[in-house]
């Protein structure tokens, strides 16, 4: 591990026959199931217009999390457009890891 200086040095050839891309239908089923386990649907109903600011911080939750919040009934979901772009470089944040103190 300590000898790898760049991710491009890792040579991996995956078996494409074993990779199955899941699509919107799986996301929809997941969200449908997720909404059945709400701990307090009444509270969500009372506070559905509560302002929720969500950012995936350049991760992959950009579509699924807002869709899940909407499915729960929240109506005032605000996203951070600059951080909606999926990027492992995290160009808009100083430290993307919350376990590390910001510089």
Q: Residue locations for each model-derived region?
A:
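Gly/Ser/Thr-enriched, mixed-charge loops and adjacent short helices
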Residues: 1-102
């Amino acid at each position: 591990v300590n000898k790898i200086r760049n991710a491009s040095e890792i040579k991996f050839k995956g078996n494409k026959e074993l990779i199955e891309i899941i699509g919107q239908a799986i996301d929809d089923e997941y969200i449908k199931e997720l909404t059945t386990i709400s701990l307090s649907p009444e509270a969500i109903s009372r506070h559905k217009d509560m302002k929720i600011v969500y950012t995936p911080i350049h991760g992959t939750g950009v579509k699924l999390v807002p869709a899940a919040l909407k499915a729960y009934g929240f109506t005032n979901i605000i996203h951070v457009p600059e951080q909606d772009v999926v990027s492992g470089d995290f160009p808009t944040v100083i430290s993307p890891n919350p376990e590390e103190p910001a510089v």
